[in-house]
A protein has these predicted regions:
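Short coil/turn connectors at secondary-structure junctions
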Residues: 12-13, 33-34, 51-55, 74-77, ...
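Rossmann-fold NAD(P)-binding glycine/threonine-rich loop
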Residues: 24-33, 42-46, 59-75, 83-104
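Short, conserved acidic/polar surface loops in the N-terminal third of protein domains
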Residues: 49-51, 67-70, 91-92, 118, ...
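N-terminal glycine-/serine-/threonine-rich beta1-alpha1-beta2 phosphate-ribose binding loop
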Residues: 1-63
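General beta-strand structural signal in soluble alpha/beta enzymes
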Residues: 18, 37-41, 57-58, 80-82, ...
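Short, glycine/charge-rich beta-strand/loop segments that flank catalytic centers
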Residues: 41-44, 109-117
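Residue-level "edge-of-site" marker
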Residues: 21, 85, 111
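Conserved anion/nucleotide-ligand pocket segment
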Residues: 104, 112-146
């Protein structure tokens, strides 16, 4: 909460939200007198993501980040997606919502961004195969055959 408060103050944020409501008292104390509003919990995350802003950075770990990402998409905004789980768990639904609401999804997760950069300026029809390497995750110990 202290790090979030410091960033909120540094970047003149209007609102700082923690997902874990147990951290809210610490966040409020760290933001006291700053003018930054503190909020906590799942509903606060979704409400924050639905606000009209220039860009939403979605970096909540795991599937917990899906509801805020969908709220930002439904607003029709630009979302810098640093959470690959939203795509893994609900990619088809998410991409349909992006198209329906005119949202823009920018990949900021390292692997997704690497593909995005490689494809930039190329026609997708000209790409036959993409090989994605990874530095970790649950498949890191699997053989290539598996």
């Amino acid at each position: 909460a202290a790090e979030l408060a410091a960033l909120a103050i540094e970047f003149d944020a209007k609102l700082a939200v923690v997902g874990d409501e147990a951290c809210l008292p610490e966040l409020r104390a760290a933001l006291a007198g700053s003018g930054v509003v503190a909020a906590g919990g799942r509903a606060a995350l979704v409400e924050a993501a639905a606000r009209p802003v220039d860009m939403t950075v979605a970096a909540i770990v795991g599937c917990a980040g899906l509801a805020p990402v969908m709220a930002a998409v439904e607003r029709g905004g630009t979302i810098a997606l640093a959470n690959k789980e939203a795509l893994v768990s609900a990619g088809e639904v998410l991409m349909q919502a992006v198209a329906r609401h005119g949202a823009t999804l920018l990949p900021t997760d390292s692997e997704h961004n690497a593909i995005f950069q490689c494809l930039s300026g190329n026609r997708i029809e000209d790409v036959a195969k993409i090989t994605l390497t990874a530095s970790g995750g649950p498949l890191r110990t699997w053989s290539a055959e598996r």
